[in-house]
């Protein structure tokens, strides 16, 4: 499994209130607001790295992921941590003059989040040359999660040329893609994974309906947070997958990445899209019960037991 995406340090803070209470709808065009961030903590993060970490929780199944992206001169410790977790970091390019990207995340009392992302070294190196024909031939799937837009497009073209099926996961970069690039990405991806807002934004930029967007992919997965997710097949079949109730809610940061890691693990093991989505949903629940994006763990036996309790069926991995 090839995972393309950001590698970052996350600085997580809490806001004791609700964001909307500090905003005046009539004055949004002249926004000048300050929020107090409490309990600042730093964690390992980045969409690509988070997905790989969650995928690695299933390494006991004999599957592995390769992280594709760029980090800075401060990546050595982070890289060792990922390697120890079972993530292959050979395709990570290092900018020895820049720093690894950083995300500043503020969460309010209703789990709404504001994020400021500093790309750092992300756009400074071309790492596609690391992706050899030998590596491409060994891939089952790939996912293109949030990264520098130009690199996402270059990688998509390379994967298409090699015949590798890939998922488009634009996330917070949805707004940044050029129209012609969005048309290419949505016309050539095997599947799309996005939340409701990102799907609406895609439709707005492409000037098409959601129904037409769904028909572009073999599968489109619409994530709904605690509402679970919807799976749309090109055939028109829609399936709803419930979320798994957490024992406690500690930190929602990275839940989407956790879902993707679990989903891709299931898919790599040959499970159906629907079964893989259930694997992803439970992985996300484990994540929300811990602070940070790479601090949750489970054994396969624990996971299978909780899966059976949540979905009333045996886990197929």
What residue spans do the PLM features occupy?
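Glycine-rich phosphate/adenosyl-contacting loop at the front of the ribokinase-like
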Residues: 1-66, 77, 317
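Conserved phosphate/ATP/ADP-binding segment of small-molecule kinases
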Residues: 154, 160-240
